[in-house]
């Protein structure tokens, strides 16, 4: 079946009845153009955030069984979106039906709240589309081998959409949101930020992992693996958006820096005077076993004792702190310092590979504006710095200006 479109609509695109009707209008036009449409939906508006805040009033949710119930609860938002959109489409005469993760099924690992997709069975979906128009699938969720509901982590509906496209053999996935593409920085922080017409997978992976909120990083990794183009569009503003594709389809020669990201979802942890190297090995082994992502790592050695500083997502701070207190005697440190008052600011661009002096320009821009650099990490296409939270937005603005990202000539174009 070659006439299938895969489209994902985020929470802001579904936040109220007017928005749902607008989404239904977009889908109805596709059906009028003789397409079958597979739609992946997020929860309406702030539903998931609101339900999480209520969960926290009941439980800290740290054990496996608590996380299982947590997934059951927070996956309910997508179920509501599915049903509401299906009703809106049926009202207009469209043959639509909602599907939950277990009904396909979408099979995942049993890592509750951070599950990974193992397999998607599309047989029932394909059979349904033979005589029907639209399948609406709940994003963000699946089920593991014990038939319990799992969720894919925040933003997981993006990953659901790309995975479903891959399972169907579709090489283009449309991602609808409330903004009209990928920008050089967050327009809420940088009013002069420019929209990119095209961006390469590896740049977008860095931007997503470093704080850009348009796409979940796992969805970009999956798109790159299966060579699925992602077209980022606004539900409410009919512009051409941004296309995410491989480097060979973009004229990269003129590019230096593609974007600046600002990530406030970070916290730093320092362990003072870790006594031996095996303590460090044990530390990061235990953190990995608990599926906690460590980013920046800084080690200072003095007389066979180490000070270790590392950063983690802010939401992982409670469980990480609990773990570190529990294993204090095992890894032998003297003091634990928690600092949530930091942000990570990063510059990203494939052009920096062949241009010396980028790091100097970044550091000089920050220090000349009295912004303290607490930590640095680099890769071929990005440099990240940790700065005090109070300086994060200023740092982003200074760097965006310094690298002239609001200049028309810096936008990605087709080759």
Model-predicted segments: where are they?
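Short phosphate-binding/catalytic loops that engage adenosine nucleotides
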Residues: 35, 94, 228, 292, ...
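A conserved regulatory-domain signal marking ACT and ACT-like small-molecule sensing domains
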Residues: 243-415
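Nucleotide/pyrophosphate-binding catalytic subdomain
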Residues: 1-220, 311, 387-388, 407, ...
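Short hydrophobic alpha-helical runs that function as membrane-insertion/retention elements
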Residues: 172-176, 230-232, 295, 375
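Glycine-rich beta-alpha junction loops
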Residues: 44, 179-181, 226-230, 234-239, ...
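Acidic-aromatic/histidine active-site loop/patch
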Residues: 223
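Terminal amphipathic helices with adjacent charged low-complexity linkers/tails
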Residues: 42-48, 232-250, 305
